[in-house]
Amino acid sequence: MNEGYIIAGLLLLTAGMIDFLWTTLWLESGAGPITRCLSAWLWKGCRKISGDHAKVLSMAGPLLLCLTLVIWISLFWSGWVLIYSSDPHSLMETQSKEPASWSDRIYFSGYVMFTLGNGDLAPNGGLWKLVTIIETAQGLLTITFSVTYLISVLSAVNQKRSFAQSVLSLGHDGTEIVHNAWNGKDFHDIDFLLVAASSELGKLTAQHNAFPILHFYHSTQHQESSIIAVAVLDEALTIFKYGIPEQYQPNQLHIKEARSSIKNYLDTVHTAYIHPAEQAPPEPDISKLQQSGIPALSKQTFQIAVNSIKERRQLLLGIIQAGARKWPVQEQAIGNAYSPK
């Protein structure tokens, strides 16, 4: 018996199983080490090759998901082939009674792992029958968890885009959302929407923590970009909290809840792969609100308050840049003044 083949096979199986279980079951820890390295390498490669072209980047997520599954299968399959190859007589042809060749072992390991079943090759002896049973169980586990993981990721991608659409339908930047929320007396019309956005963002944060691959699902449509939506929502909340007189602001608890949800999102994404930008993004222009007759604090007072949350806004810009996006006010024309309602 060749012990080198056994050791190499067990190492491949162990590496694959650790990454597989880490990624699919250990939801608190995100992706496994192999998947994490593959994700970073693939995303950087796509950005470099495409020049941040949205159409090319939109393929990074699906490609990464497929490559992850292929790597898991390859590690498991190769590991079992090496284990069977440690003994030349581990598998026998049922008709000729001859030992299986390398190609036969590859074939046998594949159909046993995918639980297909066949009769032209058979394990030779009790030990190899037990090994075959273990491989079948591992294959069934892999298929079941992989399908569940695939469905969960695709469902999370849809929810991610739904969140972006619900936020960006209110406005393309924070100032526009604040303007649209004014009912002529105060901003309480947006209270319910803040509660809904906080709830959706909380779910999205949990999904990003469980499935870091979501970071690399890039939408070609501005309206479906969750990182843009988070930045726009946070800018709107910044204006509500620091740029609007308190008597006109939305419900304070709703503002606090929404800002807390965004902070949790930032902490989750920051832990994964994001670093703050070197400079803070441009400040929201609240002078447009004043021009529309909406009560707002002085620009100087607002600037002082915004400077106090500089690190938070730098992290937001870092997320935008890492996602191959531009800060919202740079993507949307905001030069035109909003007309009063």
Swiss-Prot record:
Membrane topology label: Multi-pass membrane protein
InterPro entries linked: K_chnl_dom
Keywords on record: Cell membrane, Membrane, Transmembrane, Transmembrane helix
Assigned GO CC terms: plasma membrane
Subcellular location(s) per record: Cell membrane
Keyword Methyltransferase included in the entry's annotation: no
Transmembrane segments: 6-26, 63-83, 137-157
Taxonomic superkingdom: Bacteria
Pfam families from the UniProt entry: Ion_trans_2
Keyword Acetylation carried by entry: no
SUPFAM superfamilies assigned: Voltage-gated potassium channels
Main location: membrane
Official protein name in the record: Uncharacterized membrane protein YdjJ
Organism: Bacillus subtilis (strain 168)
Organism lineage string: Bacteria, Bacillati, Bacillota, Bacilli, Bacillales
Gene giving rise to this polypeptide: ydjJ
